[in-house]
Amino acid sequence: QIDADRLALRRKIEESLGRLEKETLISRNGENYFFLTNEERDINKEIKAVDVPGGEESRLLGSIVFEDVLKGARKHRYSANKMDFDFNRRCDNYPIGNQRDGGLLFSLITPLSDDYDAYDKAKCILDSTAEGGHILARLGNDESLGRELRTYLQTEKYVAHKNDGTLIESTKRILRDCAEDNRQRRDRLTVLLGEMVAAAEFFVAGQPLKIKAVSPEMVLWEAMEYLVKNSFTKMSFLKKLTPEADRLKEIQSILRSNDIAKEQLLFQKGEVNPEALEDLRGYVDLSSRHPPPLVPHALIETRYSIPPHAWPDAAIP
């Protein structure tokens, strides 16, 4: 009974504080509330009136997740062979940062999306098969997320616009306080979104994925490992990868030496990847029976550098 009374009292207090905040009589920063002076009230009313166009909140959320929480990661190094894979980032279908041709994809669906409720398990599974298969992460809902993001954007815009060097000292102080509150707000958002990413539902290339990792960065690593492994199923045909510079240097040296024995040895070395050679021979044999003729450069770009192969150019036998 005591706990129930406390919960009821807490709800009443929160409702009262919410009304005072809505009327701009108090200001909120996290779990702290402050009564406002007349000038502070006027400024806070102006901040609340700042327009935030559609999509800006999702772009900010995506920027915080991918740049702050995930430390700006744009590549994944696959553990089995140390190959690097670029990946693109999206948040509620808005691109975050430059998009790289041929990159993998990590798509984030958040409560800010108009279609959030439509992303049930079946839709998440289906959508994750698009574009050759990608990572789709659906964040859980948190009632403070949208409010904090919107307040952050409104405050940032207002302070930047208002700071023109002609303000009286009391107004400058209020704006400095607003900017400091916003810095703390972004820190809170980074922590909150880190927790939300770690707890998100993940779907990869048409399969729900139960993530074992607990930190956001390791969650990303685990999802990327699964995506690469299941997208590039013939990548394992390359048992040995020779660094491109070393391979070219070796070939040039042997050809210049005009040593037939060494040349024969060079070609024998190619057999360290017999499955890859067999795959290539089979495709070349099949293609040679039908026009148009094969072009090596096009062969690499249209077949062996994309799923299911992802073979480095220099490693193609």
Describe the residue ranges of each PLM region.
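Extended alpha-helical interface modules used as scaffolds for assembling large macromolecular complexes
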Residues: Q1-P317
